[in-house]
């Protein structure tokens, strides 16, 4: 058994692990990365964010071709199978792996491919694919192993028609009808993707409102859009059992209803990847979902062991995970890069997409904050008309008296890009965070960004 000594060992090469390893390496520390795959990138690159967004992009292109009358001069609407569309994602994955492999090589981070587990508080044993065991001894260890779909024990995921958000990428056919159980972010995104391929979707939600953490007007807009695009949303429903049959799946609900479809996609929660880490050897406890608890410095109850990314729970976003990993390493190397990551924009890649940052109307009303609303509807925006993307809106919430921007909510074309302008203004100190910025700034025309000017004027016109 070979023994290697490091300043920092990072478990997991997803966004959190990458952020941690790069920050520690650039601070001059000797760093090792351990990943259970034979390629870097983590679930984000191989099973989550990258393939699903590449898949979504291809589906949007198909939808544009099939719905734009101009293309009828070229030919009739085309039908594409799910496996055909998935090929585009495979190309992106290989490019991402190559880029990230280069990052580690340039920064002299040693990468070990194998299953890593704690022998003690300063030692990680890595069992490589060929059976060889490597021992890594480190002053500090960062757990960034990510998460996987939560699988209830009473559902047979070995059935060929029952999938989770990882295995759905191996779907070898295009179902005529699909049940998506769980209407969280992942469930809504996949419902949009399959709807765009012409699949009838039954989206089962155990709550009374889609994505209830969003501003209610944005949530309602998404629900309305779904109802117009082959997606039936069933609220306040819980599964009783899932029955796999020869030609499909039957979902039995506790309400007594039954739904039959060609396949079922389970999207109801995620579990931290901690079960194989040997946590009992270091005294770090995990909750019922396999997640570890950390303090504001991303330190666990063991002083030299840290956690970042999906394995610690909220907000379970790739963007936040990278910053959490970077901040965890910042706590170790003390190079001024630490910050507690809490000002995270939400990006939801439905079709159309959704993004938001800051407070929503419900929260401001409950807190008795005197706010006003400014709106810009995309159907009136020149750039949206040119792009053939009239659905959606930008909504700015601001303080009636100080004009401080309190929240930005967007639904529609390029929403995940548009939100960052509002984010930048909201991060400014004192009087620099003001709605007046948007009316005193010249925006390129035509752009989606000028929706801020339109929304700001709309909001100011509501004041008296």
From Swiss-Prot:
It comes from the Bacteria. Its main location: cytoplasm. Belongs to the class-I pyridine nucleotide-disulfide oxidoreductase family. It catalyses: NAD(+) + NADPH = NADH + NADP(+). HAMAP family: SthA (MF_00247). It is found in: Cytoplasm. Binds 1 FAD per subunit. Keywords: Cytoplasm, FAD, Flavoprotein, NAD, NADP, Oxidoreductase. The keyword NADP applies. FAD binds at residues 35-44. GO terms for cellular component: cytosol. InterPro entries: Class-I_Pyr_Nuc-Dis_Oxidored, FAD/NAD-bd_sf, FAD/NAD-binding_dom, FAD/NAD-linked_Rdtase_dimer_sf, Pyr_nuc-diS_OxRdtase, Pyr_nucl-diS_OxRdtase_dimer, STH_gammaproteobact. Its cofactor is FAD. It is an enzyme of class 1 (oxidoreductase). It comes from Pseudomonas fluorescens (strain ATCC BAA-477 / NRRL B-23932 / Pf-5). Conversion of NADPH, generated by peripheral catabolic pathways, to NADH, which can enter the respiratory chain for energy generation. This is Soluble pyridine nucleotide transhydrogenase. The lineage of its organism: Bacteria, Pseudomonadati, Pseudomonadota, Gammaproteobacteria, Pseudomonadales. One of its GO terms (biological process) is 2-oxoglutarate metabolic process. Pfam families: Pyr_redox_2, Pyr_redox_dim. One of its GO terms (molecular function) is dihydrolipoyl dehydrogenase (NADH) activity. Its EC number is 1.6.1.1.
């Amino acid at each position: 058994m070979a023994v290697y000594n490091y300043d920092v060992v990072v478990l997991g090469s997803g966004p959190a692990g990458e952020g941690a390893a790069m920050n520690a390496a650039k601070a001059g520390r000797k760093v090792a990365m351990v990943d259970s795959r034979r390629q870097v990138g983590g679930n984000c690159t191989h099973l989550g964010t990258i393939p699903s967004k590449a898949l979504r992009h291809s589906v949007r292109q198909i939808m544009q071709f099939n719905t734009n009358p101009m293309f009828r001069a070229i030919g009739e609407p085309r039908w594409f199978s799910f496996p055909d569309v998935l090929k585009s994602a495979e190309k992106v994955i290989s490019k991402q792996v190559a880029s990230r492999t280069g990052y580690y090589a340039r920064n002299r981070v040693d990468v070990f491919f194998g299953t890593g587990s704690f022998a003690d508080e300063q030692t990680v044993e890595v069992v490589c694919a060929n059976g060889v065991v490597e021992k890594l001894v480190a002053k500090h260890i960062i757990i960034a192993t990510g998460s996987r779909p939560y699988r209830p024990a009473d559902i047979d995921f070995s059935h060929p028609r029952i999938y989770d958000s990882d295995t759905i990428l191996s779907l070898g056919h295009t179902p005529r009808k699909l049940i998506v159980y769980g209407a969280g972010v992942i469930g809504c995104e996949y419902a949009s993707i399959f709807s765009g391929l012409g699949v009838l979707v039954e989206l089962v939600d155990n709550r009374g409102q889609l994505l209830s953490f969003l501003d209610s007007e944005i949530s309602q807009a998404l629900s309305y859009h779904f109802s117009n695009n082959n997606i039936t949303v069933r609220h306040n429903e819980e599964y009783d059992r899932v029955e796999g049959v020869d030609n499909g799946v039957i979902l039995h609900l506790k309400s007594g209803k039954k739904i039959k479809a060609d396949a079922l996609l389970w999207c109801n929660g995620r579990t931290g990847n901690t079960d194989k880490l040997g946590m009992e050897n270091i005294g770090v406890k995990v909750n019922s979902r396999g997640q570890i608890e950390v303090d504001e410095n991303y330190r666990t109850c063991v002083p030299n062991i840290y956690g970042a990314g999906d394995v610690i729970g909220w907000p379970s976003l790739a963007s936040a995970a990278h910053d959490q990993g970077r901040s965890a390493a910042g706590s170790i190397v003390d190079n001024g890069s630490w910050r507690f990551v809490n000002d995270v924009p939400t990006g939801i890649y439905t079709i159309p997409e959704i993004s938001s940052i800051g407070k929503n109307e419900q929260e401001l009303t409950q807190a008795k904050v005197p706010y006003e609303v400014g709106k810009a509807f995309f159907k009136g925006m020149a750039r949206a008309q040119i792009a053939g993307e009239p659905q959606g809106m930008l909504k700015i919430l601001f303080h009636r008296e100080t004009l401080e921007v309190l929240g930005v909510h967007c639904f529609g074309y390029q929403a995940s890009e548009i939100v960052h302008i509002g984010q930048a203004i909201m991060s400014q100190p004192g009087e620099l965070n003001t709605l007046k910025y948007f009316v005193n700034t010249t925006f390129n025309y035509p752009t989606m960004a000028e929706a801020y000017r339109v929304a700001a004027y709309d909001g100011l016109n509501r004041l008296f």
